[in-house]
UniProtKB/Swiss-Prot annotation:
EC number: 6.2.1.5
Record GO terms (molecular function): ATP binding; magnesium ion binding; succinate-CoA ligase (ADP-forming) activity; succinate-CoA ligase (GDP-forming) activity
Subunit details: Heterotetramer of two alpha and two beta subunits.
Binding residues annotated for ATP, in chain numbering: 46, 53-55, 99, 102, 107
A cellular-component GO term for this protein: cytosol
ATP-grasp domain: residues covered: 9-244
Top enzyme class: ligase
Binding-site list for substrate: 264, 321-323
Required co-factors: Mg(2+)
Species in which this protein is naturally found: Klebsiella pneumoniae subsp. pneumoniae (strain ATCC 700721 / MGH 78578)
Function according to Swiss-Prot or TrEMBL: Succinyl-CoA synthetase functions in the citric acid cycle (TCA), coupling the hydrolysis of succinyl-CoA to the synthesis of either ATP or GTP and thus represents the only step of substrate-level phosphorylation in the TCA. The beta subunit provides nucleotide specificity of the enzyme and binds the substrate succinate, while the binding sites for coenzyme A and phosphate are found in the alpha subunit.
Keyword field contains ATP-binding: yes
Protein name per the record: Succinate--CoA ligase [ADP-forming] subunit beta
């Protein structure tokens, strides 16, 4: 679950981290009043969406008058912002962040993620702030400095100082950076985050460090013990199909293709998408129904997949282990009949009672194509989309 920039900065303030004074506004009038609260300009106005690249898309602007603030708010509030990180529809702009402008001397980067290979929270810092860290990692990886947090000892001040020295900081900046590092690490651990990022972390003309931007991603599996973060959730920024899937404990990710995929198991789902691509198809989604492929869950999965108007065929790939394939077939038949599926459905069953399951599909009288293998399933679903 992602948070907005203004929400991230609210958390920063609770932990004593320096950030510009700002207010999130939902109307042009509120935006003008926010500027009055902040004081003399210039100000910075920012569209609040769960996506990067806002500046290049016109969603961030430095303004010198309240008239400009009103014009910016009137232009963007209620509209959708399209950036390189969104789809063609963009993300809805429901709030504008108005904050004091900062005199920037230098831009840095500071962030942390859970590194699965080392099984540690790893902090990354770079002198190349203000640009995508992925681009820095690809083109100049030597400019990214990393520190792993020991899960028993926790973050240590000396680690912050070590990163500060590698960034070329000196004097009071080392102390300020160490405080920010310790604060971010505390937020990360106490709030069950999966990602935290300040890009850019700037050095002002006065030589002070300020958190100019903030990006936080919470671990969805830990939200049950983070009630205040749950209240910050903005579902308008989420794909409604993904939100609906989460209610049924289905793992769904929307893609740009036209072949809906329903699979049990994340690894098998990725393999299924790969083989669809191999045979010239384009997956419309990733959907893992998990181990309990019951009729109810399969029905809901079909509804979610078919809510995408681009879907021209559906591939169901189920490996029956503990769950018998004949029971899964019953669920698929019931779901297709209930939902009223009007696109070709190709089903590949493998494992426990697979032959009986395939026979039930063949005898159902519904528009269900039983595949003999995964390759056969991929070829048949691609052919169905192409009308062959």
């Amino acid at each position: 679950m992602n948070l907005h920039e203004y929400q991230a900065k609210q958390l920063f303030a609770r932990y004593g981290l320096p950030a510009p004074v700002g207010y999130a506004c939902t109307t042009p009038r509120e935006a003008e009043e926010a500027a009055s609260k902040i004081g003399a300009g210039p100000w910075v106005v920012k569209c609040q969406v769960h996506a990067g690249g806002r500046g290049k898309a016109g969603g961030v602007k430095v303004v010198k008058s309240k008239e400009e603030i009103r014009a910016f708010a009137e232009h963007w509030l209620g509209k959708r912002l399209v950036t390189y990180q969104t789809d063609a529809n963009g993300q809805p702009v429901n709030q504008i962040l108005v904050e004091a402008a900062t005199d920037i001397d230098k831009e840095l980067y500071l962030g942390a993620v859970v590194d699965r290979s080392s099984r540690r929270v790893v902090f990354m810092a770079s002198t190349e702030g203000g640009v995508e860290i992925e681009k820095v990692a690809e083109e100049t990886p030597h400019l990214i400095h990393k520190i792993a947090i020991d899960p028993l000892a926790g973050p240590m001040p000396y680690q912050g100082r070590e990163l500060a020295f590698k960034l070329g900081l000196e004097g009071k900046q080392v102390q300020q950076f160490t405080k920010i590092f310790m604060g971010l690490a505390t937020i990360f651990l106490e709030r069950d985050l999966a990602l935290i990022e300040i890009n850019p972390l700037v050095i002002t003309k006065q030589g002070d460090l300020i958190c100019l931007d903030g990006k936080l991603g919470a671990d969805g599996n830990a939200l049950f013990r983070q009630p205040d973060l749950r209240e910050m959730r903005d579902q308008s920024q989420e794909d409604p199909r993904e939100a609906q899937a989460a209610q049924w404990e289905l793992n769904y990710v929307a893609l740009d293709g036209n072949i809906g995929c329903m699979v049990n198991g994340a690894g098998l789902a990725m393999g299924t998408m790969d083989i669809v691509k191999l045979h010239g198809g384009e997956p419309a989604n990733f959907l893992d129904v998990g181990g309990g492929a019951t009729k109810e869950r399969v029905t809901e999965a079909f509804k979610i997949i078919l809510s995408d108007d681009n879907v021209k065929a559906v591939l169901v790939n189920i490996f029956g282990g503990i769950v018998r394939c004949d029971l899964i077939a019953d669920g698929i038949i019931g779901a297709v009949a209930e939902v009223g599926v009007n696109v070709p459905v190709v089903v590949r069953l493998e494992g426990n009672n697979a032959e009986l399951g395939a026979k039930k599909l063949a005898d159902s009288g519904l528009n269900i194509i039983a595949a003999k293998s995964l390759t056969d399933a991929a070829q048949q679903v691609v052919a169905a989309v192409e009308g062959k």
